[in-house]
């Protein structure tokens, strides 16, 4: 089970999380949001990380030029798209950002929303399910209805997000079989962007105890 922790803003915390064994680190590249990091900060954090750390930028309907600038500043290996990006936009990124992993986030309000995934299968490498919120694109702390998603198995690797914490992750993984989990506010102590390393350690222990999932292309490009 792979673990991605999103929303780092501090170089030391990002470095420590990578050394703990977090498989992928996420950085919010959305101006005006609580965990936003600009290009200079992103470059500073990236410079503090161990070699081969997998880094993902989070975007909401961003221009390709903005994504390319962030990819270059942070030496990112992946982009996570949380807006209304179309399948055509996602496919276009394969040409404009070659070699960069594309993850499309889908905010789920009801099970019927999952039907949209079929439109993206040929345009992305992985899909992320997050809880729906009327104004926020992620990091809300809201959980999905896991039982309503039971049996969900798309035609590409998928990540579970939305309100995951050390006290509910095991329950979620008893019901669902994602390829990876993605956490942000669930490993904080109330201050956006300030991560609690003890909570991250707990999450890693829970994930390590969960076996039998198929392997997503989050860290080795396979």
UniProtKB/Swiss-Prot annotation:
Keywords attached to this entry: Amino-acid biosynthesis, Aromatic amino acid biosynthesis, Isomerase, Tryptophan biosynthesis
Keyword Repeat: no
Biological or metabolic pathway of the protein: Amino-acid biosynthesis; L-tryptophan biosynthesis; L-tryptophan from chorismate: step 3/5
Top-rank taxon: Bacteria
Pfam families per UniProt: PRAI
EC number: 5.3.1.24
A single GO BP: L-tryptophan biosynthetic process
An MF annotation (GO) of this entry: phosphoribosylanthranilate isomerase activity
Catalytic function, reaction form: N-(5-phospho-beta-D-ribosyl)anthranilate = 1-(2-carboxyphenylamino)-1-deoxy-D-ribulose 5-phosphate
Keyword Amino-acid biosynthesis: yes
SUPFAM superfamilies: Ribulose-phoshate binding barrel (SSF51366)
Enzyme category, top tier: isomerase
Family recorded in the similarity comment: Belongs to the TrpF family.
Protein's UniProt name: N-(5'-phosphoribosyl)anthranilate isomerase
Source organism: Gloeobacter violaceus (strain ATCC 29082 / PCC 7421)
Name of the gene encoding the protein in the UniProt record: trpF
